[in-house]
Amino acid sequence: MENSVENSMDPRSEQEEMQRCADQITDESLESTRRMLQLVEESKDAGIRTLVMLDEQGEQLERIEEGMDQINKDMKEAEKNLSDLGKCCGLCSCPCNKLKNFEAGGAYKKVWGNNQDGVVASQPARVMDDREQMAMSGGYIRRITDDARENEMEENLDQVGSIIGNLRHMALDMSNEIGSQNAQIDRIVVKGDMNKARIDEANKHATKML
């Protein structure tokens, strides 16, 4: 009986049990860091795809706005020709026959004036990322087994911290790009409306001259 009691309290058995628990916890923690790394890598890939799509959308908006600007330029020339033709036909003596001066309006100056593309996003203050913080504190994990598994855990968490920092910068880039594109869309809408009104006015003026 005494021997069984002594065996049940054998320090070596307790140490082995503690080591077994430590190994189990380390294995579970290692697997968790692997899953974390996989998830942030998937998020990074999704962020890259989103930035690519935003870039392509931005190029399309640029082409659309360039088209609006070309129409505006063409209408300036058309209005000049109509005015010159009106002078030859003697139509300019009556104020009602004069073309409307669209360029004098505030809406025109807002989208075709100086700094029309000037959407300046505020620059956020620099924030220390997780990698820098961990480098200063000495690492991500508290070592227990101090073996290759904990080395991999540290490497995984270091990569996770790096990717999270990249995701943070991606999010800021997306926010700035979306804000810029929204402002550009607003300009395109105004330019489209003004071009339409300008074309309608020129058509009316040309009809009166016929």
Swiss-Prot record:
UniProtKB keywords: Cell membrane, Coiled coil, Membrane, Repeat, Synapse, Synaptosome
Subcellular location: Synapse, Synaptosome; Cell membrane
InterPro entries: SNAP-25_dom (IPR000928), SNAP-25_N_SNARE_chord (IPR039077), T_SNARE_dom (IPR000727)
Organism: Torpedo marmorata
Keyword Metal-binding: no
Residue ranges of every copy of the t-SNARE coiled-coil homology domain listed in the record: 23-85, 147-209
Domain of life: Eukaryota
Organism lineage string: Eukaryota, Metazoa, Chordata, Craniata, Vertebrata
Skewed-composition ranges (Basic and acidic residues): 9-20
Entry's Gene Ontology BP terms: synaptic vesicle fusion to presynaptic active zone membrane; synaptic vesicle priming
Predominant location category: other
PANTHER family associated with the record: SYNAPTOSOMAL ASSOCIATED PROTEIN, SYNAPTOSOMAL-ASSOCIATED PROTEIN-RELATED
Name of the coding gene: snap25
Any single Gene Ontology cellular-component annotation: membrane
Disordered: region residues: 1-23
Protein name as it appears in the record: Synaptosomal-associated protein 25
